[in-house]
């Protein structure tokens, strides 16, 4: 009986496949992380069983990789108790081929590590003077505003050229936007939709702080822009001839505050907690009393049930540069926070 002979080629092929499997397994044994912390450890696990090449192909500057093939329990301990994974290898050691995105550039820091920093392109900016931002703050120029937007305020835009003002007198709003003065006498540029559709439901009616019923929020916005000052919302529904706050039903957790100056009620939020901060600016209220902040004034109004409004920033003993204009407009001061305009 003749026994079959094993072919040496088959054994070599088997060994070759086994080596290939072990090589692939070794290449995929690492873990990919989204950043390397200051303590040198990898944090925020992105994906397991990735090679360094696969992990670093994402192009992110902060992406890092660890070689150890560990179980889920070890990964959990690293992330929760140890401040991250040890033996962290950053994907990028230099700024070569690093894409930080628009408005940013890669630069080596003091520790000789690549970092994305804000570096907006300001070469095409023609206006070199100060600008007023959407946050109501004055920036020394548009480039400084762009840097602030890059760092922490992605929605920040230029409202108008020049310093932020207290009146609309010298404000030139861009495009079709209109200047409106808010409750604290700060000028804002607001874009309004002048074409308002007819209301489809009686629930759309709104009563303005001027005692006028508006068909919808759009109609109230339009009237605000035409007036040039904030009208504000008194309460939802048609205006009624109320004798007191007992006749007015407020919704959304609001409380009725009575305005003795015009003999009307207004629904206001009264659940705001005032922060214990010395950085708040005092305000002079319509009762000629000085409050530590606008929030403190609102708190006093909610406690008494009587509407209080800001006459001007600062103490009532201080002289406002716009006193004359405020006195001229006193009879038509239907001011309201700018946030109420932008919400609609």
UniProtKB/Swiss-Prot annotation:
- UniProt keyword Lipid metabolism present: no
Q: Which organism is it from?
A: Equus caballus (Horse)
What role is this protein assigned? Multifunctional regulatory protein whose primary function is to antagonize members of the transforming growth factor beta (TGF-beta) superfamily including activin, myostatin, GDF11 or bone morphogenetic proteins (BMPs). Mechanistically, binds to these ligands in the extracellular space, blocking their type II receptor-binding site to inhibit downstream signaling. Plays an essential role in muscle fiber formation and growth both by preventing the repressive effects of myostatin and through SMAD3/AKT/mTOR signaling independently of myostatin.
State the Pfam families in the record.
FOLN, FST_N, Kazal_2
Cite the record's note on assembly.
Interacts with GDF11. Interacts with activin A/INHBA. Interacts with myostatin/MSTN.
Follistatin-like domain residues = 94-117, 167-190, 244-268
Please give the residue ranges the record annotates as the region Disordered.
314-344
Protein's UniProt name: Follistatin
Q: Which UniProt keywords apply?
A: Disulfide bond, Glycoprotein, Nucleus, Repeat, Secreted, Signal
Q: List the disulfide bonds.
A: 32-55, 42-88, 56-91, 95-106, 100-116, 118-150, 122-143, 132-164, 168-179, 173-189, 192-225, 196-218, 207-239, 245-256, 250-267, 270-302, 274-295, 284-316
All copies of the Kazal-like domain together span 112-166, 186-241, 264-318
Q: Which gene encodes it?
A: FST
